[in-house]
Structure formats: C-alpha cells, structure tokens
From Swiss-Prot:
Entry-listed glycosylation sites: T377, S472
An individual GO BP term: negative regulation of apoptotic process
Post-translational note: O-glycosylated. The inner channel of the NPC has a different redox environment from the cytoplasm and allows the formation of interchain disulfide bonds between some nucleoporins, the significant increase of these linkages upon oxidative stress reduces the permeability of the NPC.
Ranges of compositional bias, category Polar residues: 128-137
Protein family according to the UniProt entry: Belongs to the nucleoporin NSP1/NUP62 family.
Keywords recorded for this protein, A-Z: Acetylation, Coiled coil, Cytoplasm, Cytoskeleton, Disulfide bond, Glycoprotein, mRNA transport, Nuclear pore complex, Nucleus, Phosphoprotein, Protein transport, Repeat, Translocation, Transport
Segments of this protein annotated with the region Disordered: 43-82, 128-148
Known function: Essential component of the nuclear pore complex. The N-terminal is probably involved in nucleocytoplasmic transport. The C-terminal is involved in protein-protein interaction probably via coiled-coil formation, promotes its association with centrosomes and may function in anchorage of p62 to the pore complex. Plays a role in mitotic cell cycle progression by regulating centrosome segregation, centriole maturation and spindle orientation. It might be involved in protein recruitment to the centrosome after nuclear breakdown.
Gene Ontology CC terms, in alphabetical order: centrosome; cytoplasm; Flemming body; mitotic spindle; nuclear envelope; nuclear membrane; nuclear pore; nucleoplasm
N-acetylserine: residues carrying this PTM: S2
Protein name: Nuclear pore glycoprotein p62
Quaternary structure (record): Component of the p62 complex, a complex at least composed of NUP62, NUP54, and NUP58. Interacts with NUP88. Interacts with NUTF2. Interacts with HIKESHI. Interacts with OSBPL8. Interacts with CAPG. Interacts with SAS6 and TUBG1 at the centrosome. Interacts with MCM3AP.
Pfam families linked: Nsp1_C
Length: 526
C-alpha cells in the first residue's frame, strides 16, 4: 500500500514512509519515502534499500546516483539505491537515452514514473515500449504514470499518478486516475507526467496479450475515486491531475467520478486520458477480457501527441506484436512550471492586495452605515415624539376652535340685539366722557406696557454687563480702558474742584490781610 506510512511493513509503500521494509521480493513503490524498503521505491527515498531485486537496465535522462542492476526506481533518489532504471530527475549514469529505435524488455520489470517531466519506458523516452508480464506499479504521491501487465498487488495512496497498471489496488485518497489493461502500448508525455497510456483492447493498440483472467477490485477508503476491473488488474482512481486511459470495443463499464474529459478524446471510447495516441498492432495472443475504465476528478490538460513510429518486440511474451505509435508534443520543463507558479503567486498577491483594499473600504462603509443607522434610529425617535406633540397640539387647537364657535354662537344674538337697539339709544354727556376715559386708559396701558418692556431690556442689559466679562473679547478690553480713563477724569475733576476751593480760600485770606495792612498804613500816615 502507499500513502503516509510511518511504520515498517512487509511490503514497500509509496509516499512518506518512515519505517523499514523487511521483505525482499515485494513490489516497488513510488512516493516520498524516508525509509529503506525491500525493493526499489520511487520518489524521494532518503534511505537505502536493503534487498536487491531482479536486474534490469534503467532508462533515465538525469540520474543522481550510480545504478546497479536491480529493479528500477524512478524519482528523486538521494540515497544509494540499487535500482537500475527509473524515470524522473535522475542526474547520473543511465544506460538508455532518448531513442527512436526498437527495444526489447526483459521480464519481471516495473516501470514506475514519479515526478517526471518526460515520457519514458524501459528503453526510450519518446517511443512506445512493451513491458513484461510480471511486475507491480504501486503509486504513492507520484506525478508520473506506470505501466505493467501481470497480476500483482498495488495500492495507491495520495498519488498524482496516471497510467495503466495491471494490478488490484486499494485506493486511499489517491489523486491519480489509474486505468488497468492487459498490455501497455503507447506512452505520451503530458505537462506533469512522464507518460500517459491510451489502451484500446479491440486489436487496435495491443502488442501482445496473455490469456484473459478475472479482474479483482479491492476498494479501500477512496476520496473522489471509483474502482474498475480489467483482466488480471484493477484500477484505483481519485483526484488525478493527469488522466490516462482510453478503452474501446470491449464490454466496458465506465464509472464517472467528477471528471473533466480531455479535449482530444475519441467520442466512441471511454476516455480518462489527457493524451491522444494512435497505434496499429497485429497481435497473435488471445484478446483481453472486459476492461473497465474509471475516472475520478481528473483535471485534464491539453492533449499532447508525440510523433515517432516505433515497433517493439516483447521478449517475455510468447506472441510478437508490431506497434506503430504516434505521439508528439513537448513536455513542460521545470523552469516553465516554476515560472507559471511564480506568475500565479504574483497574481495571487495582487488579488490579495486588491481584496484587502476593498475589505478596508467595505469596513469603512460598514461603519458609516452603522453610524447612519444609529442617527436614523434617533431621528425616528425624535420624529415619534414630535408626532405625539403635534397630536396634542391639534387636540388643543380643536378645543380652542370649539370654544371660539361657542363664543361666536353666544355673541351673534347679542350683536343682533345691539343693532336693533342702536337707533333708539342716544349718547349723553356722561357717556362721552366715559368713552374718552376708556380711550385714555387704553393709551396709558399701552404706554405702560412699552415702558415695562423697555425696563426689562435695560435690566437684561445690566445683568449682562454686571456678569463676568470675557477677557478675550476686544470690546470688553476697550470698555475697561474707557472705564479707567473715566475714573481718571473723575479723579482729576474732583481734585481740580478741591484745588479750586483751596485757591479761593487762599485768595480770600490774602485779600483780608491786604485790607488789614492798608488800614494799618492809613492809620500810620494819618
């Protein structure tokens, strides 16, 4: 099984395994494994496999390690893996390179692809190849596709893989769509997968097929996945980024699990593939049994068709077949993928910034709306109060109108009676004097009212003047200065009056003395 395994199991597991596998004859697994497994595991293997397996040449474009003749392990291998062949970013010594020639595969080999950007089989990277009749392709966190053809047991766990693998598998949160068939024929590369297989079982693309066997399906806990049976194989699907297999002209039962079909898929076939491969083979073996294609949340990409006819003869199969496959299309490089991711990240940051700006504006608007709502609520309360006051005022006015009507009703007969008696009444002298007195009293009353109003105004003005003055008012400062001048002038006036009185007294004293001296002088001269 594959997935996030943190313990040691008998069979190797693909995907973040931190345990230690102990058996030697087990199936290769792909995924991020941090342990040493029994056989070659594909993916980020940070351990050293302890058990060697069958020796096969490896097909890789870039190898990080030196390979020994054992089972091929594809993927980023950072340990000393005894696997001989694998697809993916391997920057080491590899036997086959890109070729368009015929190649033969040995039995008991497993071609597992993990995080590869090209299409590769056992002997070439673009041409189609035939694999052996025994092998397993468990996938775990694999972006690639693996093709095997014999009965085996594989489990998918958190895999992005797509490919046709002939094994019963239990899927557990597998993000790949694995279609099973009897024999793989054509591998074509998609932007995220080294190869995707298109298998048509009606003699169209089957180089050599073994006797049809019963299909076994074991469904584990799958998410967005559905299991389909094929000859001696089963397929586990679930949330695959590349979608692989097309099967046609056989009794097939296709289950759809929220998949997006590829644009270039054939209308008469049940497709789960993102690539279109046209192959013509002449087979001599028995036809395959009923195959089943399953789809599960396949995010299909544009079909890439690779051109390059090649015929491959399988050595492990009793029948020989000629496969002419055409598959064209460049694979997406890691730099292009990184540039796309960077572009998407920048766009996401711009959208986040724009969203934050809009969120701040929305928050400001929300606060404004809340404040306005509170103001509207208070205004509504005030309006209700005013309405109540208006009702009371209307009632009082109605009461006054009713009183006026009653008064008019009472005065109207009196006015009529006065009009009737006006011709017979003669005014006397006392009546005239009385009227004059009334008019005079009215005038005096009006004058008194005006005087009372004037007194009220004067009192208010005095109260305002006598209150605490505002020192900051320039008019008050001018008033203070004028008051000081007035006080000074009053003091000068008082002082001058006092001085004037003293001068007068002094002048009177001088006059009296002068008169006395004159008298004394007259007496003396006489």
């Amino acid at each position: 099984m594959s997935g996030f395994n943190f313990g040691g199991t008998g069979a190797p597991a693909g995907g973040f395994t931190f345990g230690t596998a102990k058996t030697a004859t087990t199936t290769p697994a792909t995924g991020f494994s941090f342990s040493a497994s029994g056989t070659g595991t594909g993916g980020f293997n940070f351990g050293t496999p302890s058990q060697p397996a069958a020796t096969t040449p490896s097909t890789s474009l870039f190898s990080l390690t030196t390979q020994t003749p054992t089972t091929q392990t594809p993927g980023f291998n950072f340990g000393t893996t005894p696997a001989s062949g694998g697809t993916g970013f391997s920057l080491g010594i590899s036997t086959p390179k890109l070729s368009l020639s015929n190649a033969a595969a040995t039995p008991a080999t497993a071609n597992t692809g993990s995080f590869g950007l090209g299409s590769s089989t056992l002997t070439n990277a673009i041409s189609s190849g035939s694999t052996s009749n025994q092998g397993t392709a468990p996938t775990g966190f694999v972006f690639g596709s693996s093709t095997t053809s014999a009965p085996s047991t594989g489990s998918t766990g958190f895999s992005f893989t797509s490919g046709s693998a002939s094994q019963p598998g239990a899927s557990g949160f597998s993000l790949g769509s694995v279609g099973s068939s009897a024999q793989p024929t054509a591998l074509s590369g998609s932007p995220f997968t080294p190869a995707t297989l298109v298998t048509t079982t009606a003699g169209a693309t089957q180089p050599a097929a073994a006797a049809p066997t019963a299909a076994t399906t074991s469904a584990g806990s799958t998410l967005f996945a559905s299991i389909a049976a094929a000859p001696a194989s089963s397929s586990a699907t679930g949330l695959s980024l590349p979608a692989p297999v097309t099967t046609a002209a056989t009794p097939s039962a296709g289950t759809l699990g929220f998949s997006l079909k590829a644009p270039g898929a054939a209308p008469g076939a049940s497709t789960t593939s993102t690539t279109t491969t046209t192959t013509t083979t002449t087979t001599t073996a028995a036809a395959a049994a009923a195959s089943t294609t399953t789809t599960g949340f396949a995010l299909s990409l544009k079909p890439l068709v690779s051109a390059g006819p090649s015929s491959v003869a399988a050595t492990a199969l009793p029948a020989s077949s000629t496969a002419a496959g055409t598959a064209t299309g460049p694979a997406m490089t890691y730099a292009q993928l990184e540039s796309l991711i960077n572009k998407w990240s920048l766009e996401l940051e711009d959208q986040e910034r724009h969203f934050l700006q809009q969120a701040t504006q929305v928050n400001a608007w929300d606060r404004t709306l809340i404040e306005n709502g509170e103001k509207i609520t208070s205004l509504h309360r005030e309006v209700e109060k005013v309405k109540l006051d208006q009702k009371r005022l209307d009632q009082e006015l109605d009461f006054i109108l009713s009183q006026q009507k009653e008064l008019e009703d009472l005065l109207s007969p009196l006015e009529e009676s006065v009009k009737e008696q006006s011709g017979t009444i003669y005014l006397q002298h006392a009546d005239e004097e009385r009227e004059k007195t009334y008019k005079l009293a009215e005038n005096i009353d009006a004058q008194l009212k005006r005087m009372a109003q004037d007194l009220k105004d004067i009192i208010e003005h005095l109260n305002m003047a006598g209150g605490p003055a505002d020192t900051s008012d320039p008019l008050q400062q001018i008033c203070k200065i004028l008051n000081a001048h007035m006080d000074s002038l009053q003091w000068v006036d008082q002082s001058s009056a006092l001085l004037q009185r003293r001068v007068e007294e002094a002048s009177r004293v001088c006059e009296g003395r002068r008169k006395e001296q004159e008298r004394s002088l007259r007496i003396a001269f006489d």
